[in-house]
């Protein structure tokens, strides 16, 4: 039992420092938050470790030289999607949470945009497992954003066999 507790403490460490807001040094804001909207505090080091795009962005001379808490707006995300994105970044990455599954489409796009291949892979698996007649065309379209052969083929064959099989 103690081993499981130790593992939980280890795996949940990043989520804990986010929840406690310890030593946060950057803010992320969703595109739908407006100028005075809510932002989510985070850690440059964690964002940089999870994403090459954040790493390049946060290592820029402009951000390094700033004495104030920098705010980065992720225009393409709504606030709830941003929360799910941050939740994933601070998680152990073993699976998508229920909250993350609710926003799987936007997280799939974010995984590609911010170069987090593992997030994109988990979202692809979730999208494929959730294929049904009502969303097959949407998923087929999503697979084109960056062309994703596995997602495309799954959606295409589902659609083809559902309607013509």
Swiss-Prot record:
Domains (record comment): The BTB/POZ domain mediates the interaction with some component of ubiquitin ligase complexes.
Short name of any one Pfam family annotated for the protein: BTB
Residues of the BTB domain: 24-98
Pathway: Protein modification; protein ubiquitination
Keywords noted in UniProt: Ubl conjugation pathway
Organism expressing this protein natively: Arabidopsis thaliana
Gene Ontology biological process terms, A to Z: protein ubiquitination
Physiological role: May act as a substrate-specific adapter of an E3 ubiquitin-protein ligase complex (CUL3-RBX1-BTB) which mediates the ubiquitination and subsequent proteasomal degradation of target proteins.
Protein name in UniProt: Putative BTB/POZ domain-containing protein At2g40440
InterPro entries found in the cross-reference section: At1g01640-like, BTB/POZ_dom, SKP1/BTB/POZ_sf
């Amino acid at each position: 039992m103690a081993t499981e507790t130790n593992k939980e403490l280890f795996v949940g460490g990043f989520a804990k420092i986010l929840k406690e807001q310890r030593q946060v040094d950057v803010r992320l804001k969703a595109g739908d938050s407006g100028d005075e909207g809510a932002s989510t505090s985070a850690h440059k080091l964690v964002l940089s470790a999870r994403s090459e795009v954040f790493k390049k962005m946060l290592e820029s001379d402009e951000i390094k030289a700033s004495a104030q808490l920098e705010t980065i707006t992720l225009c393409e995300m709504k606030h709830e999607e941003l929360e799910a994105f941050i939740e994933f970044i601070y998680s152990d990455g073993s699976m998508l949470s229920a909250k993350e599954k609710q926003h799987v489409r936007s997280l799939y796009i974010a995984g590609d945009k911010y170069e987090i291949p593992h997030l994109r892979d988990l979202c692809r698996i979730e999208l494929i497992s959730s294929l049904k007649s009502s969303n097959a065309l949407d998923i087929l379209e999503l697979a084109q954003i960056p062309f994703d052969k596995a997602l495309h083929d799954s959606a295409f064959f589902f659609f083809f066999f559902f309607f013509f099989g």
